[in-house]
């Protein structure tokens, strides 16, 4: 059973635990290693991309009656913020710099993330505005998502080796003018040491990442977000909620708030975070530092 408070697994999740080594590298693995350990075909890993969801864009007020664990504090801490088990989790929308209402209702998070990466040189409000339903960028995101799904289907039919989702996703990113890494890394989510490793990667300055959130609940699928870091600031784009901005040393707190939002309001608990680094090769922004420096929430 998964414990929302400390992010650890009890005996019912032994199959999940067995996929992680006990040699000190338990926080991070490449997807090919995960496939070997779990005796799964690599193409079956994270092939549910695009199954996205969100509650309406309401306030972050939490109905305690719906929270069976009585969760009001969290120990999903990051040492970068010197959090302790009793520290409250900051409401996610405190970090938000731009909204993105109703853009992902059809589950096109991969396409929306790709479009966001292409528009990094713009301002936060502009980046979100061009992704709203009815815009050309939103239609383009839907086409990219459809292309990804068709590629995955074709790869499965051809019995191609490797992760079908990873290959399809990388193809649409390259077609968009981006340069995705040839490898993904999966991090266990929940303990402070593992969250620190996620933060250390995403907060590298400068860097751009496509990030997949894997959930504990069976059939919950995987949700895709994106991050960009430059000049000591990290921007996170979640197609369900919008854009969030923090100083890079506070990325851990942002992820805690994101996890709390999905857990409390969507009943989805993050079990793993999968990262893929993107070299920003878009012709309109050859230097990542060109993207506008939004004023972080303090």
Swiss-Prot record:
EC number: 3.4.22.-
Keywords: Hydrolase, Protease, Thiol protease
Region annotated Disordered, chain positions: 1-25, 59-80, 137-166
Keyword Protease found: yes
Pfam families in alphabetical order: Peptidase_C58
A single MF term (Gene Ontology): cysteine-type endopeptidase activity
Chain intervals with Low complexity compositional bias: 65-80
Active site: 109, 223, 238
Enzyme class: hydrolase
Biased composition (Basic and acidic residues): 1-14, 137-162
Keyword Acetylation annotated: no
Biological processes, Gene Ontology terms: proteolysis
Family according to the record: Belongs to the peptidase C58 family.
Function as written in the Swiss-Prot or TrEMBL entry: Potential cysteine protease, which may play a central role after invasion of host cell.
Name listed for the protein in its UniProt record: Putative cysteine protease YopT-like blr2058
Naturally occurring in which organism (per UniProt): Bradyrhizobium diazoefficiens (strain JCM 10833 / BCRC 13528 / IAM 13628 / NBRC 14792 / USDA 110)
């Amino acid at each position: 059973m998964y414990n929302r408070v400390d992010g650890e697994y009890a005996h019912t999740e032994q199959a999940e635990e067995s996929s992680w080594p006990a040699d000190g590298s338990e926080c991070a693995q490449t997807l090919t290693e995960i496939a070997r350990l779990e005796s799964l075909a690599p193409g079956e890993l994270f092939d549910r991309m695009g199954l996205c969801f969100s509650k309406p864009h309401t306030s972050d007020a939490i109905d305690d009656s719906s929270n069976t664990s009585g969760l009001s504090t969290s120990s999903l801490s990051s040492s970068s913020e010197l959090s302790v088990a009793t520290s409250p989790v900051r409401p996610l929308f405190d970090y938000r710099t731009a909204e993105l209402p109703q853009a992902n209702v059809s589950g096109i998070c991969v396409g929306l993330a790709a479009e966001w990466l292409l528009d990094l040189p713009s301002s936060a409000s502009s980046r979100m505005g061009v992704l709203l339903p009815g815009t050309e960028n939103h239609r383009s995101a839907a086409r990219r998502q459809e292309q990804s799904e068709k590629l995955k289907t074709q790869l499965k039919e051809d019995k191609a080796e490797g992760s079908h989702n990873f290959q399809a996703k990388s193809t649409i990113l390259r077609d968009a003018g981006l340069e995705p890494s040839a490898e993904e890394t999966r991090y266990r989510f929940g303990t402070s040491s593992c969250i620190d490793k996620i933060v250390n990667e995403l907060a590298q300055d400068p860097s751009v990442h496509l990030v997949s959130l894997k959930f504990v609940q069976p059939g919950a699928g995987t949700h895709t977000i994106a991050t960009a870091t430059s000049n000591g600031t990290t921007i996170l784009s979640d197609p369900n909620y919008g854009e969030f901005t923090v100083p890079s040393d506070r990325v851990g707190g942002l992820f805690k708030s994101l996890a709390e939002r999905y857990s409390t309001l969507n009943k989805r608990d993050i079990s793993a975070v999968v990262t893929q680094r993107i070299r920003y090769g878009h012709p309109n922004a050859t230097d990542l530092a060109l993207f506008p420096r939004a004023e972080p929430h303090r």
